[in-house]
Amino acid sequence: MDRRDFLKSTALATATAAATRLALGQEPVAAAPRTTDDDVTWDKAPCRFCGTGCHVQVGTRGGKVVAIAGDQKAEVNKGLLCVKGYHVGLALYGADRLTRPLLRKDGKLVPIAWDQALDIVVDRVLANPAGFAIYGSGQWTIPEGYAAQKLIKGGLANNQIDPNARLCMASAVTGFLSTYGVDEPAGCYDDLDRADVVVCWGNNPAEMHPVLFSRLVDRRARGDKLVLIDLTTRRTRTSAFADRTIFFQPQGDLAIANGIANLLLERGTWDRPFVEKFCNFRQTTDPLTLDGRPMTFDEYRQAMSAYTPARVAELAGVSPDDLSYLADLFGRRDLRITSLWCMGMNQHTQGTAINDLVHGVHLLSGHFGKPGDAPTSLTGQPSACGTVREVGTLAHGLPGGLVVTKAEHRTEAEGHWNLPPGRINPKPGYHTVEMWRRFSTPSDQGGDIDTIWVQVTNPARSLPNVDALFYPSRKLPGKFLIVSDVYPTATAMAADLVLPSAMWVEKNGMFGNSERRTQQWFKMVAPPGEARDDCWQTIAVARRLHDRGHPGMKDKDGKFLFNIVDETDRPVPVWDWRRYYDVNVDAQLFEEYRRFSRHKHKDLAPYAEYVKARGLRWPVVEQPDHTWRETKFRFVRGDDPYATKDDVQFYHSVTKDDRALIWFHPHQPPPEVPDRDYPMLLCTGRVIEHWHTGTITMRIPQLQRAMPQAYCEIHRADAAALGVADGEVVTIESRRGRVDLPVWLDGRGQPPPGQVFVPFFDESIVINLVTLENYDPLSKQPDYKKCAVRIRRRASP
């Protein structure tokens, strides 16, 4: 089976990816191959869905997107797309697009004018600037996130901004920071083409990142010898392709990583020269910090010695033979090993710890710094890296890896923004769970967030324990919810004010994908009705604040915070929607933002370079001939321009000595363990047809028909014990809430006895009523993978 066969066979790609025409209102949409119609105009864009960053060719005619094709010139996907990518053009054309601002009056949302809507937002800010927050997204474009970041941290100076990416990749961030002193993977997708072994740590790339996974399938089809290891808590499509599937108990991944390290040390197969030259050792402290406490090699060896194969079998349910097999692979110098992970490691109350430990296994074994030797996290949103991690739209962050808690970082940011000294607040804002907890708490009981502006996300369905974190605010006096979105999501329908937004190629944009690749596209079609760019909305609010005298909307020279100019350097009133596209606002915001990028050697090229390219991987450095060169492998001399001392140089190391940190973290139990009342463990996740809460994909007819409803996977033995048959509706209940949904036995995935899997794409089946909000103490990322539940047959109505 080659890559194309794999993609066609995965889920409904058999039926849809091969289709040549798809209905789109009165216009056809080509799903591939690319049409040759003379009147179709083509341009490039990254896909709107996951963090892979596939490139598509977008065909437009008569002001509509009418065709989509994989981009043959793109290194990421080489012309291939998954089933969502082939249908991405339909994302714009759901029947219920939001086209006018809406205000809640007498319990109903009624249309209002944009001027009134913007004035309402400004009134809320001025009434309590400290209590105004923005909740954003890894689906923001880079300029959108940068504008929101500058408004909150450079203008309002309250730092109350956080993204939904806190829920999906925050633990990956803290893992990279605590290991290397700087965020994001050192390797890139090229590692998948060079690895001899790929280890999937609790993720399912066959469905979640199918175009990347197809690289592995294609290599096998060409006769390459490739070993795929699936470390997992349930059987998935990835398991079907794996050479060895190793099942472990939820939260057992920490013990497995420690067990591998112990065997490497015990057998003497760790890479002594690499470790002695490039690594230091660290252990956790109380309270926890990203820096930890130094430990000697002997202390590290002693700590790891407790994780014998027998002990790991007890903690993780992994056999000694399986653990020995993993240690044998990592102990071999003649192999190149790439580890992949995603939500299974990140949505974890010990997410930072397990990220650290997997990095540590690679460092201890020397499987780092060569093509195919890489620990690589994958992201789920198209710009969780570019807009969240790089622009710094987290409660504590500033662009380019700066943080608000460091005086020198605040000074640098104030310099880039031309702000008066002291403008930036040194106190971090609230992380996502705390932000929504405060919003859902009465103002006189500590609920000091009274207005949240949600952009490009659906927290009414994506927050954990949503009945505690989201819905109480809807009944509290003084709380006000603003939502900018393209469709009437559950969040929008609960809002006090709804602002209709432009989407994807209805606006200019830039994304940053999982391999540090920054991507650019131009507006190709107009948004419907009165829908407008999120970036414009932010700038328009800032201008009205400026005009009403808010001092934070001016820099230290008295200029407007968003001073966009024409080619003669004259200000352009881009806050007036009629003038917004007189100039390229994205280009000017990006050029301002990229000044930050050199602080942690995340250098970005000029905007014009991204117009020409299918993305560039940072750091991107200008060459003597004035061309711009991207970096495939960070910290590696000969490829990374900042690695100059040795073959590998960790030039942002926590210990300031060019050494990475190998951590010891002890095994910890899950946040909830099964008991007599709640005897099973629930894990939530995604399916190939749908993306996140289904806002877009459930409005694409082909995808909705293929997977119309969420379901519950349980083992046949559990179904027999419960007396339920395939397709029968059951009730899943936790200490927090309950949902009813049908059982699917022997479907795509199969959990072991005692475990349950439910996808979260279905707005009508709110599985996050059941989940818990316990989070990692460092990353503040919640655990969606392990909560105790009970299942019973649904009572008759």
Label for each model-derived stretch:
Residues 117-132, 188-196, 303, 324-338, ...:
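Glycine-rich phosphate/diphosphate-binding loops that line cofactor/substrate pockets in enzymes
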Residues 503-524, 530, 750-753:
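Catalytic or ion-translocation cores adjacent to nucleophile or general acid/base/metal-coordination motifs
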Residues 534-603, 677, 693, 697-713, ...:
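Long, contiguous, secondary-structure-rich segments that constitute the structural scaffold
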